[in-house]
Amino acid sequence: MIGRISAAWARCELALAACLAVSITALILLNVVTRSLGAALFWVDELAIYAMAWMAFLGASAAVHFGHSVAVTILTDTLPLALQKIAAKLVDGIVLGFALAMLWFCWRWFAPLALIQSGFDLAAFQGATFNFVYAEPTTTLGLQKHWVWSVMWVFALGMTLHGFANLIGQGANPEDERS
């Protein structure tokens, strides 16, 4: 069950990452055209950067599900098969630990309970926590940066899901996909 949920989530991550890749290309082309016409749109660069960040985090999370992450296997290739499997589970455990740490950092950074306790009053929240995550605007888009930074939640939740699925043996098997 968890493996199917992980696979569906990874497909969604990849689909959204692909849409973002197309949007980055379109934004860069728009930027080139408008600059060559002498009417540059000042917000295009920032939006392309944010789209690229979202694309990278979504792709990285999906890569964990599909087992397509970068790996140095010089040591594990020399091990007997049984030890290779143990090493792979150890890596899956470390990835899950990293994902859980990311969730914890997001929890600390966004402080949702403190925000609720302040009655969603940003001034009271900032005064009590000295946390200005919800107040900082983007440079040119006029959006609150917490919307941009929310990709960290998506990344951490996806990595946790994929890491757990891989650890219990329900993640995608890269060897099965190659055949």
Where are each of the predicted segments found?
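Alpha-helical transmembrane segments and membrane-interface helix-loop junctions
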Residues: 1-179
